[in-house]
Amino acid sequence: MTEITAEGNASITTTVIDNKNGSVPKSPGKVLKRTVTEDIVTTFSSPAAWLLVIALIITWSAVAIVMFDLVDYKNFSASSIAKIGSDPLKLVNDAVEETTDWIYGFFSLLSDIISSDGDEDDEDADEDIDKGEIEEPPLKRKEIQKEKAEKQEKPEKKIQTKVSHREKEKGKEKLKGEKPEKKATHKEKLEKKERTETKMAAKEDKKIKTKEKTEEKAKKEMKVGKQEKAKPAAAKAKETPKTTPKAREKDDKETPAVPKHEQKDQYAFCRYMIDMFVHGDLKPGQSPAVPPPSLTASRPALSTPSLEEKEKEEKKKVEKKVTSDTKKKEKGEAKKKSEKETVIDGKGKEPGKPPETKQTTTKLTTQAAATKDEKKEDSKKMKKPPEEKPKGKKQEKKEKHIEPAKTPKKEHPAPSEKHRKAKAEQAKEEIAPASTKKALHGKKEEKAKTVEQGKDVKPKLPQPQLKKEEKSEPQPKKEVKLETQLKKEEKSEPQVKKEAKLASSEKGQTRKQNITRPEQVIPHGKPEQKVPKQIKAITAEKTEKAERQEKYHPSIKTEGKPEVTDSGKKKIEKPEKESKVPPKQENLQVRNVTRAEKRGKISKDSKDAPAPKKDKDSKDVLHSKKDKEVTNNVSSPKKQKSPISFFQCVYLDGYNGYGFQFPVTPVQHSGENPGKSNSPGQKQQEQ
C-alpha cells in the first residue's frame, strides 16, 4: 500500500512541473456579482461617508441662502401676489412645469449614474467568465498537442537535408532574377519622381516669370509716372495731359482689390462697436456702418480738368513773359538815355578841390530845386514797374557789390588835399554840434564826388556807372549845407590859434582817417537815415580827444590798459574784407584802434619823460607804430572772421539805449564834472 501512495504522489508532482504556466488549476465556479444596493451599503457602513454627506448639505444650503438674499423679495412677492390675484391658474401651471422639469432632471441624473455603474459590473463579470474558460482545459490535451507538433517538425528537418545542390543553384538563379527586376522597378520610380520634380520646377519657373513680368511692368509704369511728373518744368503744356492720367489709371488697376476688403473687414466691426457704445442707436441685429467709398476711383476724373487748367495758366504765363520782356527793353533804353544826360550834367557840376566850392555854392542852391523835381519823376518811374524787373535789380545789386572793392585804390586824394582836410578838421573840433552835422554832410558830398571821378575813368562798364550816378543824385541836399559850413569855417579861424598845441598830436590821427575816408562811400543797400547817428558818434569822439589831451594827461594811465585789450579785438579787418564791410564800419573801427593805441602809448611816454616833451616824442613813435599796425592788419588772416555789425559801429562810443552796451565806453575822469556824459545830445547843450 505504501508503494502505491508513493507512486501516486510522484505522478502528481510531475504534472505540476510539466505545467508551463506555473498556476495551480482552479475548480470551475461562478464569480459573484455586486449590486448597486450592496455598494451603497458598503460605502455608508463607514462613518467617513456620512461626514462627507453632511458637509455637502451644509455647503449647498449656504449657497441657497446667499442666492435668496440677493433676490429682491419685495418686487418678487408683489409680482407674485398680483399674478395670483389676476389669473391663479397660470401661476399654478407655471409652478408645476418648473417643478416637473427640476424633478425630471434630477431623476435623469440619478438614472445615468446608476446605469453606468451597472454596465461596469456586467463587463467585469463577463471578463471573469472568459478567463475561467481559458484557464480550465484538461492537462492531457495540452500535452498531446505538444507532442504532435514536435513529431511533425523532426521529419521536415530530415527532408531539408536531402535537398540536392541543383535546387540550391536554381534558387540562387531565381534570387538573381528577382534582384534586377527590383532594380528596374526602382529606376522607373526614380524616373517618375524626376519627371514630377521637373514639372513642378517648370510650373514654379513660370509663376516666378509671371511675377517678375508684372513687377517690371509696375516699375516701368511708376518710372513713367515719375518722369512725367518731373518733366512739366521743361514741357508742361504738351506731355502731362497725355501720360499722367494713364499712369494713374494703371496704378489704380494694379493695386489689388484685396486690401479694400481687408480694410472693410478691419474697420467695420470697430465702427459697429463704437456706434453701439457711443451713440446707442444701433441694435445688435443692425448692419454696421458702411465705410466711405474709396477715393481712388474718382482720381482720374479729377486729374483731367486740373491738367487743362494748368495748360491755360502756362499759356497765359508765356504771353505775360513775352510782353514783360518787350516792356523791359523799352524802359531800359529810355532810362539809359536819361541817365547819360544826368552823367554829362554831373561831370560839369563836379568840383575838383575843396577851395573851389566857395564859387559854386551860389549855383548849387538854384540847381537843388531842379534836381528834386527830377528825383520825384525818377521815383515815380521806379515805382510803376517793380514787378516786371526782378532780373535787372539783381544784376544792379551784383554790380554795386563788385564796384566798391575796385574803386578805393584810385580814390586816394593828393597830399595837398590831405593837409587842407587836416586843417579843416582842426577848425571844426570846437564848433557847435548843429554846425558839425552840416559840415560833415558837406564833406561826405565832396568825397562822393571824388568817388564819381574815379568811376568815370572806367567807360567800359556803362550799366554800373549809370546806376551809381542814379544814387549820386541825392547830393544836392548835402550841397545846400555847404553854405553854412563855409561860414562857420571862417568863424573858427581865430580858435585854430588857441589849439595849435593839439595839431601835432592829431596830425597822425587825421592822416590815418584820410587813408580810410575815400572808402567811406555811402553803402548801397542802407537808407540815408543812419548817417546822422554816425555823425554824432564822430563829433563826440573828436571833442573828447581834444579836451582830454589838453587837461588830463596823468589820468590816461588808468584808461590805457582796458582799451588796449578792446582795440586788440578790433584790429580785425583786412584790405580784402574792406570791400565787403560797409565803409561806415571801417571808419569807426580804424578810429577806435588809433584812439586806444594812442592812449596806451602816451601813458608809456608819461612814465619816462615830463609832460611838455610828450607831443614831440609821441609824434615819431606814433608814425612808426601806425605803419607797423597797417602791415599787421594786412597780415592777420584769422582776425577777418568776425566783422563788427553796423549797429555796433554806430554805438561803440557810448550807450544810447538803442544798441548793445559795450566795454569801449570811456570812463569818467576824476577831474571832470559828474554832470558831463559822452552822449552827443548833452554836448550840444554844453557848447
From Swiss-Prot:
This protein's encoding gene: Trdn
Transmembrane segments: 48-68
A Pfam family the protein falls into: Asp-B-Hydro_N
Protein origin, superkingdom: Eukaryota
Composition bias, Polar residues: 295-306, 631-643, 667-687
Protein name per the record: Triadin
Subunit structure: Homooligomer of variable subunit number; disulfide-linked. Interacts with CASQ1 in skeletal muscle. Interacts with CASQ2. Interacts with RYR1 in skeletal muscle.
GO cellular component: calcium channel complex; junctional membrane complex; junctional sarcoplasmic reticulum membrane; plasma membrane; sarcolemma; sarcoplasmic reticulum
Segments for region (Disordered): 117-265, 280-643, 660-687
Lumenal topological intervals: 69-687
Compositionally biased residues, Basic and acidic residues: 131-265, 307-356, 371-390, 396-431, 442-459, 466-501, 539-583, 594-630
Membrane topology, record value: Single-pass type II membrane protein
Residue positions where Phosphoserine is found in the record: S303, S306
Tissues where the protein occurs: Detected in skeletal muscle (at protein level). Detected in skeletal muscle.
